[in-house]
Design a protein with these regions (language model features):
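Conserved phosphate/anionic-ligand binding catalytic regions in large, soluble enzymes, centered on
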Residues: 38-41, 133-151, 338-361, 442-462, ...
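Glycine-rich, flexible beta-strand/loop modules in the N-terminal catalytic cores of phosphate-handling
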Residues: 24, 36-121, 126-128, 133, ...
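Flexible, glycine/charged-enriched surface loops at secondary-structure junctions
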Residues: 114-120, 155-157, 224-242, 273-274, ...
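Extended amphipathic alpha-helical scaffolds
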Residues: 2-56, 241-377, 562-576, 584, ...
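Alpha/propeptide regions of enzymes that mature by internal proteolysis
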Residues: 3-14, 20-23, 37, 48, ...
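Mobile "lid/hinge" segments at catalytic clefts and subdomain interfaces of large enzymes
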Residues: 151-267, 457-555
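Conserved helix-loop functional segments at active or binding sites
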Residues: 106-114, 149, 340, 365-368, ...
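Single-stranded RNA-binding regions, centering on S1/OB-family and related RNA-binding modules
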Residues: 560-564, 571-716
Length: 716
């Protein structure tokens, strides 16, 4: 019986192309993943990312949030590699994959209807990687296109672009080589009118340059938005209707009318615990007043609380009043301390209001660098920052868990903020890890981690080029478009505000930005205002608190940190230092107790808890790679006597011959008349013949030494 093969056609296949920063961008629909609500294959240069969006047909019961999940899958076949895991499969998402998922999540989430409760899944699978074309940008564009043409309710589309700063010029979607020398890496996502996401790392870039990069990217994004708009017009599906989240507006209004004064009194405090206690008492009052008439009121309590608090906070902020009595540009009380923990390499405690972060710095050898097995170009990290957020920091009783996406994201933000000021490995050959423990949280813990990290690094003696501080800016907008920005947002302002605009940097410029929104985007006026007030605030933090605490990095690393010596040898000598099967280097490590790392270029890093062990290891290596130089003086031991001269050891296993005629100023009959085995003597290298044999002269050495001593030189 023969098999009949039918050639499959793709009747719904569509292809859209445009030029993006000098490279072709292609969006293909209707060929892959036809059963998803929508799927778009994005190809930019030779980078290909499949973006699929699906939605549950019915809302999830019993929730008061939008259940959106975004996954960015890194497939190592995309870069022609097999995973290094035991089963040779990709495992859980790596840090970069999680961070990219968050970058995609942040701009699309605010554009869904606020009362939409259907599960929505966004999955971006990286299938091919051209390092000149960012998979992150492909994921953002593909997700925007897929959601826009799907039947899922969404108020997009958005466009996305990266901007670099190369030789003082702004560059769209910089290539791999340009990124290596770029002073800026900012991702900007925008709708047709506003900017909805900014994520930046920068080498102390001034505000005006950062603003111009954002403005130019927003304008360039309109080309992508126009292309996706064309797709929607030609192949877009009608958006499906959904049941709107249930809410009792009548009950809400009665509660507001009856208890507005008590609610304002409950909110008006700078103590988070007091505010929550007062609010719990207020909820009890609601039960007394309304439970009999509204027996199902408990299922609305969370949303009633949210809407009521937001109503108060918004009205106050628009009037220039904050819940803790501060002015809109006023920072909470600050405190800074270093040397908090006795035996760690460096520690810093940073306090801002009821937010408190303890950061601890640890130094180790370069073998402790984090190895990365990803699709990205970076293969290892020398500077690492980890952020921990235990339940007790917000007064919750919950068990410890492994870091979630939020912890990883906040840790990466603080890491990115400090990276531009970390000294190069040539100047400071240590692996560096900072752990920030959030011990109390009332907003802006990520920015507290940045300040704490700076304190810990300086306390550890890491010669950072400039101290870094971080601060967040909030936003409230009125219905007429007027807005108020306010600095150093605390928890309740973050929860009920429309923006968390985090900016970190030095006095010279910005090192990191992360922007979270709960509205439909920011105008250029708001962005410029946020950049300006965060600059003033971080300078205030540096001048008034951090620098008075520790003005500059300690001159030396902690006595508990490993001592480090760096050598540079001829790469051809590496084999001799390592030895057959590692025998030589293992012997050096055993004898000295030091750790030794050898780079392919001949750079050797020696580390040990004490300087003596480093010195022993260094001498062993110096002896192995020692090459005598003609004309140089050496102080060596006589190891063998022959009738024609004496052999003097210049370094272990390396000796030279002092002919009998070169042993003394006068003629001697026997070598034994001038020296014996074990004697130490000065010798001068007079010749190294073509076979590598070294000829020495004690007579010439002493003549040169006497001349130097007569001239007042000290011979060592």
């Amino acid at each position: 019986m023969s098999t009949i093969i039918t050639h499959r056609q793709f009747p719904h296949y569509h292809k859209y192309t445009m030029d993006l920063a000098g490279r072709p961008l292609t969006l293909e629909v209707g060929k892959l993943a036809e059963l998803a609500n929508a799927a778009v294959m994005v190809t930019y240069g030779e980078t290909s990312v499949l973006c699929c969006v699906t939605a549950a047909p019915r809302p999830r019961d019993g929730i008061d949030f939008f259940p959106l999940s975004v996954d960015f899958e890194e497939k190592l076949y995309a870069v022609g590699r097999i995973p290094g895991s035991f089963n040779r499969r990709e495992g859980r998402p790596g840090e970069k994959g999680i961070l990219t998922s968050r970058v995609i999540d942040r701009p699309i989430r605010p554009l869904f209807p606020h009362d939409f409760r259907n599960d929505v899944s966004v999955m971006c699978t990286v299938m091919s990687v051209d390092h000149d074309c960012s998979p992150e940008i492909c994921g953002l564009i593909g997700t925007s296109a897929a959601l826009a043409i799907s039947d899922i309710p969404w108020n997009g589309p958005v466009g996305a672009l990266k901007v670099g700063l190369v030789d003082g010029k702004l560059v769209f979607n910089p290539t791999s080589e340009q990124r290596k020398v770029s002073d800026l890496d900012v991702t900007v996502v925008s709708t047709g009118k506003k900017v909805v996401m900014i994520e930046a790392g920068a080498n102390q870039v001034p505000n005006d340059v950062m603003f111009e990069a954002i403005r130019m990217a927003h304008e360039e994004n309109q080309k992508q938005i126009a292309l996706i708009g064309q797709m929607v017009a030609e192949i877009g599906k009608p958006k499906f209707d959904y049941p709107h989240a249930d809410f009792d507006q009548e009950l809400f209004q009665k509660i507001v009318d009856a208890t507005m004064d008590q609610a304002k009194a409950a909110m008006d405090t700078d103590d988070k615990n007091v505010r929550e206690a007062r609010w719990n008492q207020l909820i009890e009052k609601w039960h007394e007043l309304f439970l009999e008439d509204y027996p199902e009121m408990d299922k609305y309590l969370e949303e009633i609380t949210y809407k009521f608090q937001k109503k108060i906070v918004k009205a106050w902020l628009l009037e220039g009043h904050r819940v803790d009595g501060r002015q809109k540009n006023e920072i909470r009380p600050l405190a800074a301390e270093v040397g908090v923990l006795p035996r760690v390499h460096g520690s810093g405690l940073f306090t801002r209001g009821q937010t408190q972060v303890l950061s601890v710095a640890t130094l180790d050898t370069l073998s402790a660098n984090q190895k990365l097995d990803t699709i990205w170009e970076e293969t290892e990290k020398r500077y690492m920052h980890h952020y921990n957020f235990p339940g007790y920091s917000v007064g919750e009783a919950k068990p410890a868990r492994s870091p979630g996406r939020r912890e990883i994201g906040h840790g990466a933000l603080a890491e990115r903020a400090l990276l531009p000021v970390i000294p190069p490995v040539e100047e400071f050959p240590y692996a560096i890890r900072v752990v920030s423990e959030v011990v109390s949280s009332n907003g802006s813990t990520s920015q507290g981690s940045i300040c704490g990290s700076t304190l810990a690094l300086m306390d550890a003696g890491v010669p950072i080029s400039a101290p870094v501080a971080g601060i967040s800016c909030g936003l409230i907008q009125d219905d007429d478009g007027s807005f108020t920005t306010f600095i150093d947002i605390q928890g309740v302002e973050d929860f009920h505000g429309e923006m968390d605009f985090k900016v970190a940097g030095t006095k010279k410029g910005i090192t990191a930005i992360q922007m979270d929104l709960k509205n439909d985007g920011l105008t250029m006026e708001i962005i410029k205002n946020a950049l300006d007030i965060t600059y003033d605030a971080r300078c205030q933090i540096l001048d008034q608190i951090m620098l008075p605490c520790i003005a500059e990095p300690r001159p030396e690393v902690s006595k508990y940190a490993p001592k480090m010596i760096t050598l540079h040898i001829d790469p051809d000598k590496i084999r001799e230092v390592i030895g057959k099967g590692g025998s030589v280097i293992q012997k050096i490590v055993a004898e000295s107790g030091a750790k030794i790392d050898i780079d392919d270029d001949g750079t050797i890093h020696i580390a040990s808890p004490d300087a003596e062990s480093c010195a022993i290891a260094k001498k062993c290596i110096d002896d192995i790679v020692f090459v005598p130089e003609v004309g140089q003086l050496y102080y060596g031991r006589v190891v063998r006597l022959m009738t024609f001269g004496a052999f003097v050891e210049l370094a272990p296993g390396k000796d030279g011959l002092v002919h009998i005629s070169k042993l003394a100023d006068k003629r001697i009959e026997k070598v034994e008349d001038a020296c014996k085995v074990g004697d130490m003597m000065w010798v001068k290298v007079t010749e190294i013949d073509e076979k590598g044999r070294v000829n020495l002269s004690h007579k010439d050495a002493m003549k040169e030494i006497r001349a130097k001593e007569a001239a007042g030189e000290i011979i060592k």
